[in-house]
Amino acid sequence: MSFMRGGSECSTGRNPLSQFTKHTAEDRSLQHDRVAGPSGGRVGGMRSNTGEMSQQDREMMARFGAAGPEQSSFNYEQMRHELHNMGAQGGQIPQVPSQQGAANGGQWARDFGGQQTAPGAAPQDAKNWNAEFQRGGSPAEAMQQQGPGPMQGGMGMGGMPMYGMARPMYSGMSANMAPQFQPQQANARVVELDEQNWEEQFKQMDSAVGKGKEVEEQTAETATATETVTETETTTEDKPMDIKNMDFENIWKNLQVNVLDNMDEWLEETNSPAWERDFHEYTHNRPEFADYQFEENNQFMEHPDPFKIGVELMETGGRLSEAALAFEAAVQKNTEHAEAWGRLGACQAQNEKEDPAIRALERCIKLEPGNLSALMNLSVSYTNEGYENAAYATLERWLATKYPEVVDQARNQEPRLGNEDKFQLHSRVTELFIRAAQLSPDGANIDADVQVGLGVLFYGNEEYDKAIDCFNAAIAVRPDDALLWNRLGATLANSHRSEEAIDAYYKALELRPSFVRARYNLGVSCINIGCYKEAAQYLLGALSMHKVEGVQDDVLANQSTNLYDTLKRVFLGMDRRDLVAKVGNGMDVNQFRNEFEF
């Protein structure tokens, strides 16, 4: 499979801009919000179709090409007066030939040949620099001789006139101006000092400077030596040196703090499998999430077993916000409760609160690295937030935990993979999951989780048809899994099959009516087909399920901004700006019940 989407390899030798494109094709997926589809602006930007030149343009081009040296746009008359005024204080400056006179080649050659270059660069001869400056060639002449050729040639780059003309203009000036300046340099070297005289003069100047430096260095060395002797004498007289205890004790303490205290961590990192090191590399190379923010008002803090209450709420279809509070109480009572952290993360993800879900799932994996459910849920959350490399590395860790023989065999063939971009990492992890899927090809013992992992990988690479096949294969094994139906619906929606996606979301809500994310996705699909009122009803229904009895929405630590922002879009699509003003954190959803059913 090929995962390269760019076409920068075509004609790279003829188009320098394609080389620039290759430098900008680095993986920055950790800095993006979502997986974006192909940009519609590329088609317009690469157009090279140009219309036929009009008669007005032809006349303008003819006038421009017929312009002689007399119509130059470079006028140095004002600069000549400025230089004359500046040099009047130090001496008389020779008159600069006018621009029209400069165009006379014979007179200019006689003036140029009659000049003499100053043999030295002493400060008293600084007034001669003005004369030397005046003897330089006129850039205006070079532009007049050059003509409009390079600019016209550069305007033909399809859709990119500025980049197309910049490089030819620069190269044209260099090529045409270089022959004009080379004779000046050759004539100037005739009156320069010969090699022997130049070396003698340089030695004299270097000797004068060296003597000053030598005196300064000797003075500094003397002062340093005196200061060192004084410090040594004071130390010897006031406090004898204790060689046995002076330095070694401090060195040993620093060694204990910096090395021995971190020995376990260092050994764990050194002895850990290669896939484990890759996991830490890719997951840590993203924006760090803060610690999980707990709700202040939690009615389950006084309950003796809040974890049990949370599990019951999830299994019986209770409100996800209440189940999240129960799991929060459980982890606050026991911060090392890995299963509670994992269920809290899964609950928040289903409640359309991705950030707290990632924080909780990462905490679970830190406590229990082999928690397969948390690893799979975390990879999905990473994908939703656009952290694709972290998602792929998490899937590899999941596979290494459940199918170590597949990963170990691949690692033995290529122990250390080095730095990989998004496409290389995706290709390698996808190949590993395909090998794992081939372990049960008959379909009877198919691993639904392997199919889910493959579906997430294909989804991240925008291969939606393959992802749909994988999720359908997983649903064939677990037809009552609401999560699978929701993931199938999201994949169908991204492949522009909104009607089929709506059916999948309905199935997910039929299995779990409190599934807030499925309601949110259903509202988005309704927006895509222009059913704004139905979309508003689903979004308002999802927001109503965030309501917790006895707790105000505006004081919740974890809120879903996606729901509020999408609801505003719906009201704008309905041209109901009066309703847009009512949407915000802490709003009372009951105020919309007069117009919407939810």
Swiss-Prot record:
Membrane-traversing stretches: none
The keyword Transport is assigned to this record: yes
Keyword Ubl conjugation: yes
Main location group: cytoplasm
Keywords, comma-separated and alphabetical: Cytoplasm, Isopeptide bond, Membrane, Peroxisome, Protein transport, Repeat, Thioester bond, TPR repeat, Transport, Ubl conjugation
Membrane topology type: Peripheral membrane protein
Post-translational modification comment from the UniProt entry: Ubiquitination at Cys-10 is UBC4-independent but requires the presence of PEX4. Ubiquitination at Lys-22 is UBC4-dependent.
Location of region: Disordered: 1-54, 135-154, 208-237
Annotated InterPro entries: PEX5/PEX5L, TPR-like_helical_dom_sf, TPR_rpt
Cross-link type Glycyl lysine isopeptide (Lys-Gly) (interchain with G-Cter in ubiquitin), residue numbers: 22
One Pfam match: TPR_16
TPR repeat segments: 304-337, 338-371, 372-409, 410-447, 448-481, 482-515, 516-549
Compositionally biased intervals (Low complexity): 220-233
Cross-link entry Glycyl cysteine thioester (Cys-Gly) (interchain with G-Cter in ubiquitin), positions: 10
Biased composition (Basic and acidic residues): 23-35
GO molecular function ontology, one term from the record: peroxisome matrix targeting signal-1 binding
Family (UniProt): Belongs to the peroxisomal targeting signal receptor family.
Protein function: Binds to the C-terminal PTS1-type tripeptide peroxisomal targeting signal (SKL-type) and plays an essential role in peroxisomal protein import.
Record's protein name: Peroxisomal targeting signal receptor
Organism encoding this protein: Yarrowia lipolytica (strain CLIB 122 / E 150)
